[in-house]
Amino acid sequence: MGNNKRDIALPIIISFVLLVVLFVAQFLIPSIQLFGNNKQSTFQQVFELVKNKYVDPVNLDSLESSAVDELLKELDPHSTYLKPADLAEATELLKGHFEGIGVEFSLFNDTATITYVIPEGPSEKAGIRPGDQLIKANGILMVRKNNSTDTIRSIIKGERNSIVNLTILRDQQTLQINVKRDRIPLPAIESSYLLDSKTGYIRLARFSETSYEEFMKAVETLKSQGAQQLMLDLRGNGGGLLSEAIDIADEFLDQDKLIVYTEGNKIARQEYRARRPGQFEKGKVFLLIDEFSASASEVLAGAIQDWCRGKIVGQTSFGKGLVQEEYSLSNGSALRLTVARYYTPLGRCIQIPYHNNKDTTKKLRYFLNSCKDTLWEENGITPNIKIATTNDTALISSANLMHALTRINQFSFRYYQDNISFFNKKDTPLSLLRDTELSHAIWANWIFAEKSSKNTSTPYSFIEKKFLTERILATLARYKWRNNGYYQVLNANDSTVNKALK
């Protein structure tokens, strides 16, 4: 029986993949005949027969998209087909800006509530305030069951200079406000401040077109404030533009030092070296990484580690050592195809095996840098200073805490709004952390809110209480001091940050 099913499925799968080859080839190189003549290929004939003769209506676009996805799965985990809508969103992240109304919001009981209005942005100019609830946009109802932030975002975003009419609820009154959309920056650096009198801290979320420029401004500011050493936090940074990682690495390394090289079956070796005197070639450097630090983050970390320029601290990185190039397709989509591997200055490819093709008999190579560190290939970037996976990971995996985390934003925003005069008197983010009376009051209010809404029946452990209280305090700090406040509170008791400084 099992063999019969396989026999039936196999021709379908083969046909599916063959169709993909045709479609991708047509999109990428439409002017080239696949077989050197003008006759229709077998693939084209099959496509036309399906299109014109198949028993049921066929959504050819959907079939094509699914077929491409199946083909790419056979290659590697990082070759990707992006539909037009997905491409637009991915491009925004790499561009470092998007077009919208300039607000942050959270969903509270299926209603989008404005939690922050960008200064001098389109919404502030129009009179939108924190606490306003979004009811409609251009007549489209935005209060609905099972609402999502993606749905709300897609409604209020739009082309620059276009107008969106918002219906908002403020103090039980309904208001109509027109907002003229504009370009909104999407910073790559989430936070930069002095950890102590001599240590500058920069948290880089992604490598976008603005990352290097933002990095240089942050370094200049920190040095002017007295920073003599630098902590660059790449935790959770999944990568982005290789060129930005190379430019940032250049600021740490002497001129002409190799930063990274790429090479592929169809791509000749291409070396990237430091080209100019760097802004931070002297002074201690700490790079923080975790299991979500990938790609361009690993390029930067690998260069720093291979040249003994700084210490890598945290957990072993993701292990993505493949380079993608983007090809625009005729239907408005794009193919991000792996064309090369990248190698650290010592020659390490840190790409972990994929498709369960790990060769257990293969003897992995290791390399020694001038610090006599043993550095392995095909295993991501292993930190010089390893930090055990924090208790946070185990905590967040518990159902009790997972549910609680979804309610922190709503609780914190309301607490902040109800006590705004109190927070206006606070002068630094760390003053919140040192205020034990505030911590007790927050926890008492949290427990009261939880019991009132019957959100949990399981008592919180001491560790869970500490974890939640710190995150509520950090979220409160964000409402007043933005991301710098948030990370100053969280980093105060962060084991990776503190270990790096010891």
List where the protein language model places each region.
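Cleft-lining beta-strand/loop regions that shape enzyme active-site pockets
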Residues: G2, F27-K39, F43, F47, ...
